[in-house]
Regions:
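Hydrophobic, membrane-embedded alpha-helices of multi-pass small-molecule transporters
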Residues: 23-42, 160-168, 200-201, 215-269, ...
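TM-loop-TM module centered on a large, flexible mid-protein loop between adjacent transmembrane helices
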Residues: 91-92, 98, 130-142, 217, ...
Length: 463
């Protein structure tokens, strides 16, 4: 078994043996966009409008989400330049706080919040695919059985989701270059698809948004703003995935910080422009509570052809998002196995394809099982609290590593230190506290799930 780093502040010594350093800055920037842009931007604004019916405040929420994500990217970029290794955030937590906290991060990510996200996005892909192939709809039940927990059903959409995951696993199995090519093509396609909405709005819009600070029917704007931020943060999640693939970047110390900053800045700009197009396509009354807001906006601007175009864009977007997720998630599993806290076989690299093939298969099989179980959404909700908490703790690593390892080279230092890391920590802390107050059951469940990882860690360490 490979030796594992022991105490905080020790430099990682285990190399990413066998992996191919094939990714440059352009690929890394597109990876940030590809891993973050899934279905959120197409679905969340209508839900936000139901609690915050003001175009100005909704745009402020999206801008605030961009500032939070950018402060996170700037903060983690320093640690990324110090430890340009596969595993990303897992490695930073290990070096700053020790192996147990790093293990708990990987435990939560791989078992629930990341694999559950893959399952949810895959089912979303199948749901939109049913727009052009109705027989693949989630409402078409193929099999059902009674269980002690209730009736377990498997729909056509769940089967399509499993096929989607398997296809992407195969693409990433045969090489990081093939996975990267797919990501580049699909990310460019989804960004072009999103760009069509503002262009249509410029040409065909007949709605003039009410750019007032607060609408008259918003009795508690601050409370509504906080609720809306949950949707924004979800749509901005996964910015950190690019750190997990550092072991396959050609010059990660230079390019990884740049990719985080450029990618998140572009993402924020895209989200703001697309939301502005929604407000020019539909009056606020028609936006409120609408789930498929992009589809409805496109219909208002270009009729049924617009709706079909959006459906195609979402299909491309969700497929591409999961391609990036499988590519990145397997590297986290690989890093944990390399450190001896997961099955050692997952640290193997394919002799021909130079990919962590066992890790790719393991992640994809587990995500497929979650998709078939139908319970991923509930589990995902429970553990997102723990995910936000761990990323907040990870940001403290910048301060801790400056004290523990002042001698370690830092090709990039956080711009605006210490203000920028503090902004992310305070924003994350507010979100964690709000979730704890508003959703105590889910928050406690997330903490309990993390606690279950402690005996698993000690068992893996004793092997």
């Amino acid at each position: 078994m490979a030796a594992r780093p022991g105490t905080p502040g020790t430099t990682a010594v285990l190399p990413d043996e066998g992996l191919v350093r094939a990714l440059g800055l352009g690929s890394a920037v597109l990876f940030v966009l590809g891993s973050v842009i899934g279905s959120g931007i197409f679905l969340t604004t209508g839900v936000m409008a139901s609690v915050l019916p003001s175009p100005t405040l909704i745009l402020l929420a999206w801008a605030a989400g961009g500032v939070i994500a950018l402060s996170a990217g700037l903060t983690y970029a320093e640690m990324a330049s110090m430890y340009p290794r596969s595993g990303g955030v897992y490695v930073y937590l290990r070096e700053a706080f020790g192996p147990m906290l790093a293990f708990l991060y990987g435990w939560a990510a791989l078992l629930i919040f990341f694999s559950g996200g893959i399952a949810a996005v895959a089912v979303g892909f199948a749901d939109y695919l049913s727009y052009v192939a109705p027989s693949l709809s989630p409402s078409r039940i193929l099999w059902s059985a009674a269980t002690p927990a209730g009736t377990w059903t498997v729909s056509a959409a769940q089967i399509v989701a499993v096929v989607c995951i398997a296809a992407l696993a195969a693409i990433n199995y045969i090489g990081v270059r093939s996975g990267n090519r797919v990501n580049v093509v699909l990310t460019v396609a989804k960004v072009l698809g999103l760009a069509a909405l503002p262009i249509l709005a410029l040409i065909a819009a007949d709605v003039t948004p009410a750019w007032t600070p607060v609408a008259a029917n918003v009795p508690r704007p601050l409370a509504g703003f906080g609720i809306a931020m949950i949707a924004v943060l979800w749509a901005n999640d996964a910015w950190y995935c690019v750190t997990w693939i550092a072991g396959e970047m050609r010059d990660p110390q230079r390019d990884l910080p740049r990719a985080l900053i450029i990618g998140i800045a572009l993402l924020t700009g895209i989200y703001l422009v697309v939301n502005i197009s929604y407000f020019y396509a539909l009056p606020m009354a028609e936006l409120q509570g609408v789930t498929r807001v992009a589809e409805q906006a496109a219909t208002a601007l270009a009729g049924t052809n617009g709706a079909r175009f959006v459906a195609l864009t979402v299909i491309i977007s969700t497929f591409g998002c999961n391609n990036a997720a499988i590519l990145a998630g397997a590297r986290l599993l690989f890093a944990m196995a390399r450190d001896g806290v997961f099955l050692p076989v997952a640290a193997k690299v394919h002799p021909q394809y130079k990919t962590p093939h066992i890790a790719i298969v393991a992640l994809s099989v587990w995500a497929s099982l979650l998709a078939l179980s139908g319970s991923y959404e509930q589990l995902f909700t429970y553990v997102m609290f723990a995910s936000s908490l761990l990323h907040m703790i990870g940001a403290f690593g910048v301060f801790r590593l400056r004290r523990l390892r002042p001698d370690l080279p830092r090709p990039y230092r956080v711009w605006g230190y210490p203000v920028v890391p503090i902004v992310f920590i305070l924003a994350s802390g507010a979100f964690v506290l709000n979730t704890l107050i508003e959703r105590p059951r889910e928050s406690v469940a997330g903490l309990a799930f993390l606690a279950l990882g402690v005996p698993v860690y000690w068992y893996s360490k004793a092997r």
